[in-house]
């Protein structure tokens, strides 16, 4: 694992000039790393697959094209040079708990940024990237964000290669209680929602993350709301209204494929 700190000179340089450490010439024959940080409950997993499987499918990848590393079970990835990109899944865990496996993964992410590896984090992965590079993560003061919600692009997304042609507003699936409260130095916010000012961020040139879930389909969200509706109702969430509003999110769903096609195309 990488021994250096989030505030080091090397990290600041990587945030500003990631191309100085690695070009886009990461071999197209290398696998995509999926950093698996947790799973849904057994019932949802049996119906829809685990989070690593869902993110693999949403990215248009096959099992032979990925290396799934269950970091939450103590597995560790190889060196960043072994991969053409890394995707970081969601998780029921909380980044603010700073579990040892999570902190070890954060150290690997700092090493990967220095190496110039393209990365895309989702939900827990979004928060872990921010935490790894000096941001602050905690419970969202606006409360839990669940269901299909509207994401709004900010002007900073206008010149971004990944977001070219993306509508200024689009629906996305949400499922989170914690959020990025404070950005890492040098990070750019690309999108927001009514309850979260940091729905999508970019770090350096080729590291992206979303609080929303590109990999979740409407059936998964409906099933989740059905299973956890009582808990959410106790938090004064309008569960029937949330369920009725669930719908397909094709723009959000396409972001993982767009990311790989743009920054880490395969053979």
Model-derived features: positions:
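Hydrophobic/aromatic beta-strand patches that form the interior of the parallel beta-sheet core
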Residues: 33-35, 67-69, 87, 120, ...
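Short glycine-/acidic-enriched loop or helix-start segments at secondary-structure transitions
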Residues: 44-45, 78, 97-98, 130-132, ...
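Short, glycine/charged-enriched secondary-structure capping and boundary segments
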Residues: 47-50, 81-83, 100-103, 134-137, ...
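Pocket-forming structural segment of enzyme catalytic cores
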Residues: 133-219
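C-terminal and late-domain segments of enzyme folds
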Residues: 188-190, 196-202, 206-267
